[in-house]
């Protein structure tokens, strides 16, 4: 009898707890549809289910807000203005949004939870962003760890981007083995030296990342990217390799690939000031886009130079392209500096880190380095070194333009 009574009491307690949870859920968790009002325009309103994030709700309605980190809250790009219904700003957002901006309603769309009706404001250019399923034309090594991915835009479509802009590329769930990569013989030595073929990338969900375009607007019908493989650091070889770069390196001619865009803010200023471009690694992409656009589309007569840093001649690419531009345009010169030239390179050009080379061979004796505009993209250490050098020369922030994607 005591056992039966105990079972009954236990069951009643469980049922009571379930009822409490259901009651709390009915009060705390929103049900039914919610409406997102956009730019005070009824035709732009979005009706969706509660429970997700604002970034996903916008994407589901065909409104693609830039998010280089794929919604993780680390890039700070998916900024929107939430006028009501977004709740309190989260600590994860305060790394990217000042207190003053927060008071104005600035939020990261990837961090805003969908709980109730919401009123938001988006930049008008967002509505020009589209999504395309592209076809891989080619995916060739340009350096030991850099591929040039060339995508064909669907017939009849165009991506209305500006030089220095970027797109977002989607990687589906995948299992990629580095051993399956087709690495040309000239680059295999380093891959084997660092035992890179042992790595795999296994991902169970879709991932989105941003890449700057290497082509310029008059190279119609294509998107061209420079993608550096993101292998684990030598001092921590057991961490997972880069999800997106691993996927991109696995693509072959004829494969399909989904992109969205265009996005961007790393655009050239419309002035007559001298332009100094500084790049390294896959930071070549926006440098090529900008320089080609200035010289081949705009036929600019602005004085400009390009300074590119690489390890050895094996890591130099687009050399013939830039040599041709320099030959055809008296206002353009370019230089490459090798930080670790190989004996077989027989290199007689500049050596060392590019920020030192730029300073020692040009800016130190420049009559007004503070009047130039500096456009740069490269590894974080290069960017920091160049910016530090420019600050020492008295260059103002407004004349230092940085693309953070290309390292």
From Swiss-Prot:
Cofactors demanded by this protein: [2Fe-2S] cluster; FAD
EC annotation from Swiss-Prot or TrEMBL: 7.2.1.1
Pfam families, alphabetized: FAD_binding_6 (PF00970), Fer2 (PF00111), NAD_binding_1 (PF00175)
Main location per the UniProt record: membrane
Domain FAD-binding FR-type: 129-269
GO molecular function: 2 iron, 2 sulfur cluster binding; electron transfer activity; metal ion binding; oxidoreductase activity, acting on NAD(P)H, quinone or similar compound as acceptor
Keywords: 2Fe-2S, Cell inner membrane, Cell membrane, FAD, Flavoprotein, Ion transport, Iron, Iron-sulfur, Membrane, Metal-binding, NAD, Sodium, Sodium transport, Translocase, Transmembrane, Transmembrane helix, Transport, Ubiquinone
UniProt topology in membrane: Single-pass membrane protein
Paired cysteines (S-S): none
Annotated localization: Cell inner membrane
Annotated coiled-coil segments of the chain: none
PANTHER family: NA(+)-TRANSLOCATING NADH-QUINONE REDUCTASE SUBUNIT, NAD(P)H-FLAVIN REDUCTASE
Family recorded in the similarity comment: Belongs to the NqrF family.
This protein's name: Na(+)-translocating NADH-quinone reductase subunit F
Species per Swiss-Prot/TrEMBL record: Vibrio campbellii (strain ATCC BAA-1116)
């Amino acid at each position: 009898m005591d056992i039966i009574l105990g079972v009954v009491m236990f069951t009643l307690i469980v049922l009571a707890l379930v009822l409490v949870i259901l009651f709390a859920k009915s009060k705390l968790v929103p049900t039914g549809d919610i409406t997102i009002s956009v730019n005070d325009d009824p035709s732009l309103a979005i009706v969706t289910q509660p429970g997700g994030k604002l970034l996903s709700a916008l994407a589901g309605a065909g409104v693609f807000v830039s998010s280089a980190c794929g919604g993780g809250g680390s890039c700070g790009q998916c900024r929107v203005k939430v006028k009501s219904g977004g709740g309190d700003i989260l600590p994860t957002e305060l790394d990217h949004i000042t207190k003053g901006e927060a008071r104005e309603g600035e939020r990261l769309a990837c961090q805003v939870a969908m709980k109730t009706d919401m009123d938001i404001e988006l930049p008008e250019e967002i509505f020009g962003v589209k999504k395309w399923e592209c076809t891989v034309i080619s995916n060739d090594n340009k350096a030991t760890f850099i591929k040039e991915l060339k995508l064909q835009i669907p017939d009849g479509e165009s991506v209305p981007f500006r030089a220095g802009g970027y797109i977002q590329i989607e990687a589906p769930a995948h299992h990629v083995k580095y051993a399956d990569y087709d690495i040309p013989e000239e680059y295999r030595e380093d891959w084997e030296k660092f035992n890179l073929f042992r790595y795999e990338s296994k991902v169970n969900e879709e991932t989105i990342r941003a890449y700057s375009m290497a082509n310029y607007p008059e190279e119609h019908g294509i998107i061209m990217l420079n993608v550096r493989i993101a292998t684990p650091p030598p001092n921590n070889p057991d961490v997972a390799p880069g999800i997106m770069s691993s996927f991109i390196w696995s693509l072959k001619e004829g494969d399909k690939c989904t992109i969205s865009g265009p996005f961007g803010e790393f655009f050239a200023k419309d002035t007559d000031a001298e332009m100094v471009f500084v790049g390294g690694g896959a930071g070549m992409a926006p440098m090529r886009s900008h320089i080609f656009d200035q010289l081949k589309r705009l036929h600019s007569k602005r004085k400009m130079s390009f300074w590119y840093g690489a390890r050895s001649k094996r890591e130099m690419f687009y050399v013939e392209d830039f040599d041709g531009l320099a030959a055809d345009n008296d206002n353009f010169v370019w230089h490459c500096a090798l930080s670790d030239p190989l004996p077989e390179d027989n290199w007689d050009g500049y050596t060392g880190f590019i920020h030192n080379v730029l300073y020692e061979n040009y800016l130190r004796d420049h009559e007004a380095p503070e009047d130039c505009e500096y456009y740069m993209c490269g590894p974080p250490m290069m960017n920091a070194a160049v910016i530090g050098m420019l600050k020492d020369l008295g260059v103002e922030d407004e004349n230092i333009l940085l693309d953070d994607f290309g390292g």
